[in-house]
């Protein structure tokens, strides 16, 4: 007992010393190299993903698409993300984070090239599905790669800094759009977007593995991933069939092949049942935690993506700005989100993850309505408001990976994070279509504003009250985790450490 008490005291003393030192002095050149590679991968991921939003009106005009069909091209990438997160995440858990990152970059680069070559709507829709597979894999593998390599007390910063790369990639894409598209047309933008594949070869040759993953491998224990549980054990044939059903249902929901609300509702419920079944099989008695985490991510996408997906269209059509002005404001939004990601990382390590999340979202709520009240002549004021809203309303979402990671052990972290996050990201697939439906009854600006404002409050409740831990304790308290596996902070309802008990 005395020995364990000494360890706890020493840990607390070390934590106090760490907080007094400048944070970046705790990082080695190797850890910075790992971060730089993962951050660049995220930047390229963000660059490729937002290209369709920038040229959506041009694609819609050339292919003769309806607004719903055009919006489905944004949603298509989300249809496959759940499987990409699961499969590539499991590969990351078993074979290493680096290999998964390389495969992910190759997939979304090839999908981007296919978008530029697409002769029509169907081919572009399929190409966007391939982009979704790669994007999901990049997300899960890069996040776990950096979080597992950085010191425990800096892991909010690790998450926040990393996700900023996605937003900066979007802002960079906006600038490339303003230069390339007026000269060579919208297809040329996608050809530029295939360049990340060169970066994949650098990653394959020059990066080490994450610290936590290497330690886990040294234990020589068999790794039982979610892919093993779902597709290699007794229910494998049923789960393969369920996966096919999920893909088919998602296609019906998001391809625009039907506008029958009842049919779409039935398909959505079938998908929900499949994913809940997978969570139940993969997490056992901890399925309430998995479902609540999925809802957290879903509502994060629902409140944020209508604004991100339709911002270029709103600026071009409703505000009637030139391509150069659209690119400038979209760049400000991207860099606002990136700055917010970094600020969120500092806030998370300072105040705690959940408290930082709530405070940041409340500030963002104060700004969202004024964004849509500004007259079109006040371009810089509009840009400043959008920048501020993205800093506090969108940027704080960079802490979501850290939140989810804390509910999984190392051997299932990448697949768990990848699957939960990317199933929840279907909220991003719903968001553009939901925005288009609401906009059909009102203006696009009103639809974007109302959805963002209302749905943000749902996220405030889910994260602010730690609903994953609460619901877990209501249903299966014996399976509840006491402490975050990433930073050791207590979850809701955790017992205080009692040295005498230990």
Curated annotation (Swiss-Prot):
InterPro entries named in the record: MFS, MFS_dom, MFS_trans_sf, SA_transporter, Sugar_transporter_CS
Membrane topology field: Multi-pass membrane protein
The keyword Membrane appears for this protein: yes
Catalytic activity from the UniProt record: N-acetylneuraminate(in) + H(+)(in) = N-acetylneuraminate(out) + H(+)(out)
GO MF annotations in UniProt: carboxylic acid transmembrane transporter activity; sialic acid:proton symporter activity
Locations listed in the record: Cell inner membrane
Protein purpose: Catalyzes the proton-dependent transport of sialic acid.
Protein's name in the database: Sialic acid transporter NanT 2
């Amino acid at each position: 007992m005395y020995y364990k008490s000494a360890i706890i005291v020493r840990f607390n003393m070390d934590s106090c010393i760490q907080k007094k030192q400048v944070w970046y002095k705790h990082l080695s050149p190797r850890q910075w190299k790992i971060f730089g590679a993962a951050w660049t991968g995220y930047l390229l991921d963000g660059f490729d993903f937002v290209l369709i939003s920038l040229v959506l009106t041009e694609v819609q005009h050339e292919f003769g698409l309806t607004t719903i069909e055009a919006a489905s091209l944004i949603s298509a990438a989300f249809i496959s993300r759940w499987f990409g997160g699961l499969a590539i995440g499991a590969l990351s858990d078993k074979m290493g984070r680096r290999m998964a990152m390389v495969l992910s970059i190759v997939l979304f680069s090839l999908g981007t090239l296919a978008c530029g070559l697409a002769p029509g709507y169907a081919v572009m829709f399929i190409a966007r599905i391939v982009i979704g597979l790669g994007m999901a894999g990049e997300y899960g593998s890069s996040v776990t790669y950096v979080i597992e390599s950085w010191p425990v007390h800096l892991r909010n910063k690790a998450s926040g800094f990393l996700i900023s790369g996605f937003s900066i990639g979007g802002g960079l894409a906006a600038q490339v759009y303003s230069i390339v598209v007026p000269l060579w047309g919208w297809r040329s933008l996608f050809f530029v977007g295939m360049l990340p594949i060169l970066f994949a070869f650098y990653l394959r040759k020059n990066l080490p593995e994450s610290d936590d993953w290497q330690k886990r491998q040294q234990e020589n224990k068999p790794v039982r991933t979610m892919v093993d549980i779902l597709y290699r054990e007794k229910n494998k044939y049923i789960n393969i069939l369920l996966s096919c059903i999920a893909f088919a249902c998602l296609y019906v929901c998001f391809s625009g092949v039907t506008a029958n609300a009842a049919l779409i509702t039935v398909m959505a419920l079938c998908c929900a049942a499949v994913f809940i079944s997978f969570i139940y099989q993969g997490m056992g008695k901890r399925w309430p935690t998995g479902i609540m985490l999925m809802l957290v991510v879903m509502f994060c996408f629902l409140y944020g993506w209508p604004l991100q997906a339709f911002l270029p269209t709103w600026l071009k059509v409703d505000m009637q700005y030139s391509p150069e002005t659209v690119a400038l404001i979209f760049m400000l939004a991207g860099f606002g989100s990136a700055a917010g990601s970094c600020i969120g990382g500092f806030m998370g390590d300072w105040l705690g993850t959940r408290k930082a999340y709530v405070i940041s979202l409340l500030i963002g709520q104060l700004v969202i309505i004024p964004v849509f009240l500004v007259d079109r002549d006040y371009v810089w004021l509009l840009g400043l408001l959008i920048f501020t809203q993205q800093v506090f309303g969108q940027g704080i979402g960079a802490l979501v990976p850290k939140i989810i990671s804390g509910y999984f052990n190392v051997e299932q972290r990448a697949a768990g994070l990848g699957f939960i996050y990317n199933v929840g990201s279907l909220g991003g697939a719903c968001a553009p279509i939901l925005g288009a439906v609401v906009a059909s009854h009102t203006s696009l600006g009103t639809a974007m504003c109302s959805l963002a404002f209302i749905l943000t409050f749902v996220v405030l409740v889910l994260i602010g009250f730690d609903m994953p831990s609460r619901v877990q304790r209501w249903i299966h308290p014996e399976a509840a985790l006491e402490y975050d596996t990433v930073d050791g902070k207590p979850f809701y309802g955790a017992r205080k450490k009692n040295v005498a008990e230990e």
